[in-house]
């Protein structure tokens, strides 16, 4: 004999930190907790936003304490940070690098230029947002966005991963 909970009750108890007893939910919780605590981003710096991205790795913000360690190879990374103006010629390279990443893969669009073309929106050679080339999970606004904004975006990505339901 047991207690039957509706979906709403089950989700409420799970959010409040009660022990999860369904085996599938337990496995999902553990996998998502591990994934969110060890993000390995690869930088795809194209303009001035890449300089601000370097600040987040410095001692003041220290992304390492959140388990975020930058990688140089797309085969080792699970997050790609697109920072700066994406031109039409670089779009194919962006897609190729994205395809080389292992699943599950996430994309963070950093800055106004990567989000929607920014200052160069009406230029013939600029892609109006990297979401036209790769699927984007988190948008970080600003021109250029501050290191705090990127840090907040990475924390939002961690929360999104924790909420993900695995199949």
Swiss-Prot record:
GO molecular function: 4 iron, 4 sulfur cluster binding; iron ion binding; NADH dehydrogenase (ubiquinone) activity; NADH:ubiquinone reductase (non-electrogenic) activity; quinone binding
Catalytic activity: a quinone + NADH + 5 H(+)(in) = a quinol + NAD(+) + 4 H(+)(out)
Pfam families associated with the record: Oxidored_q6
Superkingdom: Bacteria
Keyword Zinc in record: no
Statement: the UniProt record of this protein carries the keyword Membrane: yes
GO biological process terms, semicolon-separated: aerobic respiration; electron transport coupled proton transport
Cellular localisation: Cell membrane
Keywords on record: 4Fe-4S, Cell membrane, Iron, Iron-sulfur, Membrane, Metal-binding, NAD, Quinone, Translocase, Transport, Ubiquinone
Cofactor, free-text remark: Binds 1 [4Fe-4S] cluster.
InterPro entries for this protein: NADH_UbQ_OxRdtase-like_20kDa, NADH_UQ_OxRdtase_20Kd_su
NCBIfam families per the UniProt record, alphabetical: nuoB_fam, PRK06411.1
Function, in words: NDH-1 shuttles electrons from NADH, via FMN and iron-sulfur (Fe-S) centers, to quinones in the respiratory chain. Couples the redox reaction to proton translocation (for every two electrons transferred, four hydrogen ions are translocated across the cytoplasmic membrane), and thus conserves the redox energy in a proton gradient.
Family: Belongs to the complex I 20 kDa subunit family.
Protein name (database record): NADH-quinone oxidoreductase subunit B
Originating organism: Wolbachia pipientis subsp. Culex pipiens (strain wPip)
GN (gene name): nuoB
């Amino acid at each position: 004999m047991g207690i039957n909970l509706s979906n709403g009750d089950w989700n409420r108890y799970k959010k409040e930190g009660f022990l999860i007893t369904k085996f599938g939910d337990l496995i999902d919780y553990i996998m998502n907790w591990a994934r969110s605590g060890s993000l390995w981003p690869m930088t795809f710096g194209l303009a001035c936003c890449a300089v601000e991205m370097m600040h987040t790795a410095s001692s003041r913000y220290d992304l390492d304490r959140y388990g975020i360690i930058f990688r140089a190879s797309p085969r080792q990374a699970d997050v790609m940070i697109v920072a700066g103006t994406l031109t039409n010629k670089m779009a194919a390279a962006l897609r190729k690098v994205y395809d080389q990443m292992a699943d599950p893969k996430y994309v963070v669009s950093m800055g106004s230029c990567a989000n929607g073309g920014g200052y160069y929106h009406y230029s013939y050679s600029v892609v109006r947002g990297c979401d036209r080339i790769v699927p984007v999970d988190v948008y970080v606004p600003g021109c250029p966005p501050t290191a705090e904004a990127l840090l907040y975006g990475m924390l939002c990505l961690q929360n999104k991963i924790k909420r993900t339901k695995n199949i």
